[in-house]
UniProtKB/Swiss-Prot annotation:
Pfam family name, one: DUF3452
Matches recorded under InterPro entries: Cyclin-like_dom, Cyclin-like_sf, RB_A, RB_B, RB_C, RB_fam, RB_N
SUPFAM superfamilies assigned: Cyclin-like
Function: Key regulator of entry into cell division. Directly involved in heterochromatin formation by maintaining overall chromatin structure and, in particular, that of constitutive heterochromatin by stabilizing histone methylation. Recruits and targets histone methyltransferases KMT5B and KMT5C, leading to epigenetic transcriptional repression. Controls histone H4 'Lys-20' trimethylation. Probably acts as a transcription repressor by recruiting chromatin-modifying enzymes to promoters. Potent inhibitor of E2F-mediated trans-activation. May act as a tumor suppressor.
Region (Pocket): 385-944
Keyword flag Kinase: no
Region of interest: Spacer: 585-779
Keyword field: Cell cycle, Chromatin regulator, Nucleus, Phosphoprotein, Repressor, Transcription, Transcription regulation, Tumor suppressor
Gene that encodes the chain: Rbl1
Full protein name: Retinoblastoma-like protein 1
Amino acid sequence: MFEDEPHAEGAAAVAAAREALQALCQELNLDEGSAAEALDDFTAIRGNYSLEGEVIHWLACSLYVACRKSIIPTVGKGVMEGNCVSLTRILRSAKLSLIQFFSKMKKWMDMSNLPQEFRERIERLERNFEVSTVIFKKFEPIFLDIFQNPYEELPKLPRSRKQRRIPCSVKDLFNFCWTLFVYTKGNFRMIGDDLVNSYHLLLCCLDLIFANAIMCPNRRDLLNPSFKGLPSDFHAVNFKAAEEPPCIIAVLCDLHDGLLVEAKGIKEHYFKPYISKLFDKKILKGECLLDLSSFTDNSKAVNKEYEEYVLTVGDFDERIFLGADAEEEIGTPRKFAADTQFGKLTSQASVDCNLQQHFEKKRSFAPSTPLTGRRYLQEKEAVTTPVASATQSVSRLQSIVAGLKSAPSEQLLTIFESCMRNPMGNIVKIVKGIGETFCQHYTQSTDKQPGSHIDFAVNRLKLAEILYYKILETIMVQETRRLHGMDMSVLLEQDIFHRSLLACCLEIVLFAYSSPRTFPWIIDVLGLQPFYFYKVIEVVIRSEEGLSRDMVKHLNSIEEQILESLAWTNNSALWEALRASANKVPSCEEVIFPNNFEIGNGGSVQGHLPMMPMSPIIHPRVKEVRTDSGSLRKDMQPLSPISVHERYSSPAAGSAKRRLFGDDPPKETLMEKIMAEGTQLKIAPSSVTAESLSISPGQALLTMATTTVTGTTGRKVTVPLHGIANDAGEITLVPISMNTTQDSTAESLVSLTAQSLIGASPKQTHLTKTQDAPLTGISKPKRTGSLALFYRKVYHLASVRLRDLCLKLDVSNELRRKIWTCFEFTLVHCPDLMKDRHLDQLLLCAFYIMAKVTKEERTFQEIMKSYRNQPQANSHVYRSVLLKSIPGEVVAYNGDYEMTDGDIEDATKTPNCSSEPVKEERGDLIKFYNAIYVGRVKSFALKYDLSNQDHIMDAPPLSPFPHIKQQPGSPRRISQQHSIYVSPHKNASGLTPRSALLYKFNGSPSKKAKKRVIAISGDAESPAKRLCQENDDVLLKRLQDVVSERANH
């Protein structure tokens, strides 16, 4: 990708770029300073990158950046940013569509290493474009519903200036209504990129134009006679409009997915006062906006005001939707059916497809389905527009809290009063403090986004408070039943629990309204640590069944964001929790439930499959049963085996929790002592057998699986063992039987470290205390508590993503387990590698290095291609990785394990054209891998190099790989409209022994009975059905196809 071109060719290219830039600047009337800066940046970038596509498009990106940095003094001794050149003009001159601009601009920002403030500006601009595109798609059909089709009327005849004015056409009305909307929306910047509020503002504009059309006696021809909002006597010959302008807000909300209360609030408190202000400023005039004498002046005045707004405040001229070349310039939807010729359909379909792909890639209005947490998803709703989806989310939220108040219910008050110390006062104080902080930041303008009106803030806060008390009551009822009436004071007195729960409710409300204040805005303004906030997410999802499918996906994606990066920042509370636990990072085996690992060395066939799509919805009764530990079936893994109490327990899972709840003995168990101190294990002589054992009261019996020991002769010995542990912490392993290829005499006792037998390999020995085995078949992990829960979720998230990558790249189970072992090694022994970095960065590096070591190589380009298809993938993850300070000496790494630029198609170099000094050194993933990662992991990874005999003996056992979490609930409801449930197939036991013959009286003729007897008694298999050949690869491929097909729907 980074090719050195001849000097002459490079000079010619720069000259051509300079000529193209000069022509562009002349057309835009730009100053020389901005042009020179744009050319310098372009030349620096081109020296480091191969820029694909037209040069003029990249010049437009460079020119836009230069213009945004330009400051122009104004008459009022202020300053104005932007050279008075709108983005629309730049793109129109460069013949670059908006969708292409956003795509290229993202790459340009990465290559130029532009500051975060500029990136956020582009993100706001892109979201504003997306909101406007979605609103315009709704505007056209609503306009057609109310008014005549503007493309069915005859074109205007040319006329001289002396001719008198003619009435406005439907097309003029269409353009005026949209321009008035975008100009009004620009005035209310707090509404601009809020989809729900913007849509209701559009309904207000349509309502205003309709009222003027009704009130003007000669303009009723503009209206659609079949519109349902017309007055009942509209078609009467002597129809006379009422004195008060009619309001059709209710009709529009009913017909076009609006929220009546929200829309009327926008009209009364924002739109009507603003229109009055426009009349006072003489921008609008006349008794009727559509009067013959005033419409033209009104249209010109609104367009002039909006042009000034675009040049001074805005970037994106939203009138571009109305242009004749809108489809080419931006990718807007088709105008109207009557205007669309047959020849345009193909190109229009392509434009709509590009627009749809852009929205799907951005995921602004419909969050993608994360790889984890799918068991909580409900069934898919019918396909709706983004506006309908947003308004339905708000309606659903309002239906959840309907009839409730922002205060504790009688039942919740009873729970508070039953506590040893009534927490009511403290809870009210916390809620009030969070409410004040939220309103202050929600209404405050910042560089990132404008402030909203206090009415919006109060409305959002009230919804969140009602939801908070509702969910808190549900949690308390579940916990009381789960813990059999235990006192709730400890949980209810934890401020972090209430702050996290209310913050989560606020996030739900903001997401329902499609607010631009996206996560982690809410925890930033409330000062919440992500490491604490994530604990409440699953609790909320399980406690509130009314959440929509998109809402659950959004909350799941937030949890993934925290687990993958936000909890690993330099100032995260995670590092304090690790210090409190003596910096002992738990391994996967210590935190995952023992029965949640794959079985066998290579893993089961099931273990090679990706996360299976779960049935959409869990039956409420099944979910209710699962939350009650007392009602769990013996063979059922609980949905969340950790209670809310345990989630908010002290990071040290011993003292506090045990004193408060008494569910663990206060004394350190023998097994904990053994694991902590690395007890020496001894194999007793073969003369000692399990049958001759006698166990004293101070000893414990340990049940063992088989272990494989390599003797001095190199022979492998399979030894089934029993173990006895005494008070001194020593374990004596007693062989039950020994199978070898030849007879061998018992030698002196073989010393093995505990790590070798309680390590990570599924072949290894597992030590469990017999008396500690739970009767329900659900055994607890070795480490519990707050920190263990966090790492359990981290390991699960990483395993799901790795499984998905391995499936797409056709990686063997053996290599997958080695990658997993390497990844776990970095988390446990090199936790600092995760500081201010991303989980996927370490996962991708582990994948690459182990593929190199084992000679099952995958190029980084192949790995990245598969990674980009994951729902959470973001180019920032692999293009901007934190780099530590590197010593002056260059470490001579083995070239075989170094990543080269040829391995990745879009590797990035950091050019020296950064607009601001870089606060921290960052680079692409290749640079991080070669400069930092290899040096820390190479010695460990080389132990799995099978081509080197010295390494085979040193290779640690492979870590166990978590298996797919199966849906524990059964039966599962698959539809909310129909009572249809899915249950696992049960092997029905026959009513009679298999040796007997089944004869059905009055149903089995004698001839068929004879044939049945012959078929059963014969040795040959019945040819009634075609035999299925046992081919695991074919079966696996079919299952993979089914899974992929389900995942794409």
